[in-house]
Amino acid sequence: MNKLMKQAQKIQEKMKLIQEEISKLEAIGESGAGLVKIKLNGSRYCNYVKIDNSLLKDKEMLEDLIVAAFNDAIRRISEIQQEKIASVSSSIQIPEGFKMPF
């Protein structure tokens, strides 16, 4: 039982480190061949939006491209997070059925 408690504590410590590292990650989503760029951090907060001046006259297209860039950024940050979790969790024994907190 003591061994299981120590292992659980190690898992908890590693997960805390993973969460801290993930919050520092960044990803840029793009659409319109790079005409719209959105940068998100690991907590999925938007850091910036870049819009090419050529898009300012077409509101509907601009709106669609912003949505597409945001969705691309979400996809990219999710992939980076999953890779990070997989790389760390492969080094520890996680009990079957254990769900990650994020």
Curated annotation (Swiss-Prot):
Main location: cytoplasm
GO MF assignments: DNA binding
GO CC list: bacterial nucleoid; cytosol
A Pfam match: YbaB_DNA_bd
Keyword DNA-binding attributed: yes
Keywords on record: Cytoplasm, DNA-binding
Domain of life of the source: Bacteria
InterPro entries: YbaB-like_sf, YbaB/EbfC
Compartments, as annotated in UniProt: Cytoplasm, Nucleoid
UniProt family annotation: Belongs to the YbaB/EbfC family.
PANTHER family: NUCLEOID-ASSOCIATED PROTEIN YBAB (PTHR33449:SF1)
Purpose of the protein: Binds to DNA and alters its conformation. May be involved in regulation of gene expression, nucleoid organization and DNA protection.
Subunit: Homodimer.
NCBIfam families according to UniProt: DNA_YbaB_EbfC
Official protein name in the record: Nucleoid-associated protein WIGBR5260
Organism of derivation: Wigglesworthia glossinidia brevipalpis
Native organism taxonomy: Bacteria, Pseudomonadati, Pseudomonadota, Gammaproteobacteria, Enterobacterales
